[in-house]
């Protein structure tokens, strides 16, 4: 049962990550996941934000923020870039934030004017988590908690979270191919 839940979470996590990180999908393919995340953060106010896809800069993810006369437009080359643009706008223009331990999301009635011209990351991958993380509370997280963590990562521009799920199954296959017997491996879990 525990293996089934872990496998299901891993597959779902990979699907969400691919949807947020794919550069070869249609426009709605990067816009909808970003919109959904923003809607989870601010509810109906998400409908007041224009989201647009822009081309990567020299193969690197890029974003822009423009707020003028109460209209907020976020542009990005991926869902993660758009989400990071949103996070940047909240932090810089609205003095708002969401963290692991709380939030300050008192948003103004109209979006304050703000302009941040094209920002391009120098990094292809923005990594998060470590091997110890999966030994703490994550095995007991439900989908709501995982979604919160994935949203947190996207808002901060993370596009490569560590996923050690299934490493034991892979190691078992390797050991079996190397000649160990199934009964020898079962002793490991005692």
PLM features: residue spans?
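Extracytoplasmic soluble-region selector
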Residues: 50-51
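Bacterial N-terminal signal peptides that target proteins for export
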Residues: 1-9
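C-terminal motif of bacterial Sec signal peptides marking the signal peptidase cleavage site
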Residues: 18-19
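Feature activates predominantly on carbohydrate-active enzymes
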Residues: 29-33, 37, 54-59, 68-188
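Glycine-centered helix-coil hinge/cap
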Residues: 39-44
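Hydrophobic helical h-region of N-terminal Sec-dependent signal peptides
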Residues: 10-14
């Amino acid at each position: 049962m525990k293996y089934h839940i872990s496998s299901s979470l891993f597959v779902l996590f990979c699907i969400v990550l691919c949807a947020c990180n794919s550069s070869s999908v249609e426009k709605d393919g990067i816009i909808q996941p970003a919109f959904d995340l923003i809607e989870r953060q601010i509810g109906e106010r998400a409908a007041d934000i224009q989201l647009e896809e822009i081309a990567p800069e020299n193969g690197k993810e890029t974003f822009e923020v423009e707020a003028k006369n109460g209209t907020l437009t976020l542009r990005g080359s991926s869902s993660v870039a758009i989400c990071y643009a949103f996070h940047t706008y909240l932090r810089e223009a609205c003095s708002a934030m969401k963290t692991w331990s709380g939030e300050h999301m008192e948003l103004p009635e109209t979006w304050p004017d703000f302009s941040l011209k094209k920002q391009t990351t120098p990094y292809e991958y923005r990594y998060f988590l470590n091997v110890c993380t999966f030994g703490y509370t994550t095995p007991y997280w439900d989908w709501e908690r995982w979604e919160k963590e994935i949203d947190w990562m996207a808002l901060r521009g993370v596009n490569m979270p560590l996923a050690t799920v299934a490493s034991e199954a892979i190691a078992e296959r390797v050991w079996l191919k190397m000649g160990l017997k199934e009964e020898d491996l079962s002793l490991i879990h005692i």
